[in-house]
């Protein structure tokens, strides 16, 4: 039989208690609750906080700890009281803007972790797509952001691994030393960097879960690039979960110069 879904006020996870009372008073096992979750506003819409683990306030709150609090609240209010929950929409508010808004790797960490919390607390997730996620025009039904699609599919089954820092390494000149990339494994093991030779172009320290990229390899790639922008993409693979792509970017510091005209 079909279930009736009732939302909290404004589908807000902070307004759970009134809905709990309503559902309990109705005493109907065919009623479930729903909330929507788009993460912390300043992270989700990139209002100055780009990192999933970047402090939002002086208390050390992050987008990750905010997700912890939100999902725990929903679980303790509804699930522990035998009321099913559907997260009827989740995502990030800046998704429509492509990579212009949310930092891609940090967005992936968000999806990975929200799925982990949903498994932990027995919640059902529904990814909100208003046309920005899946191509429905060509008939191919492919993800417009393939890495998002891969992460979402993988995260429904288990955890994925990623770099502890950003998914981008910036170089304003040739590297003077090897480059370290610390990994957050989440229970998996590192396998390889696709197309590279371990022991020559990179090495891996299992005890610290750190990949070391050879400066000779970096500088070779850097020298082959003739202009600012992305000059390499390194695909890290693991024993389970989605792959992780680390981008190599060549940049030049902007310079202020004289200009003329009207404003």
Give names to the regions the model predicted:
Residues 14-16, 43-45, 135, 193, ...:
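Short acidic, gly/pro-rich beta-turn/loop elements at beta-sheet edges
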């Amino acid at each position: 039989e079909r279930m009736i879904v009732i939302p909290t006020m404004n589908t807000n996870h902070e307004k759970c208690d009134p809905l709990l009372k309503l559902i309990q008073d109705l005493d109907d096992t065919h009623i479930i609750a729903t909330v929507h979750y788009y993460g912390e506003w300043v992270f989700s819409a990139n209002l100055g906080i780009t990192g999933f683990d970047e402090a939002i306030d002086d208390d050390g709150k992050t987008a990750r700890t905010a997700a912890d609090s939100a999902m725990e609240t929903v679980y303790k209010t509804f699930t522990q009281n035998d009321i099913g929950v559907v997260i009827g929409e989740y995502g990030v508010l800046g998704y429509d803007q492509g990579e212009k808004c949310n930092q891609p790797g940090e967005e992936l960490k968000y999806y990975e972790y929200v799925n982990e919390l949903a498994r932990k607390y027995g919640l059902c997730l529904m990814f909100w797509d208003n046309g920005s996620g899946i191509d429905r025009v060509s008939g191919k039904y492919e993800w417009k952001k393939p890495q998002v699609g891969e992460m979402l599919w993988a995260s429904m089954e288990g955890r994925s691994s990623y770099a502890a820092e950003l998914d981008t390494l910036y170089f304003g000149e040739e590297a003077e030393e090897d480059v370290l990339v610390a990994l957050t494994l989440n229970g998996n093991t590192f396998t390889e960097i696709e197309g590279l030779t371990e022991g020559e172009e990179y090495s891996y320290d299992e005890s610290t879960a750190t990949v070391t990229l050879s400066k000779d390899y970096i500088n070779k790639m850097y020298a082959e690039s003739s202009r600012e922008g992305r000059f390499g993409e390194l695909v890290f693979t693991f024993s389970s979960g989605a792959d992780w792509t680390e981008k190599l970017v060549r940049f030049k510091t902007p310079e202020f110069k004289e200009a003329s005209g009207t404003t």
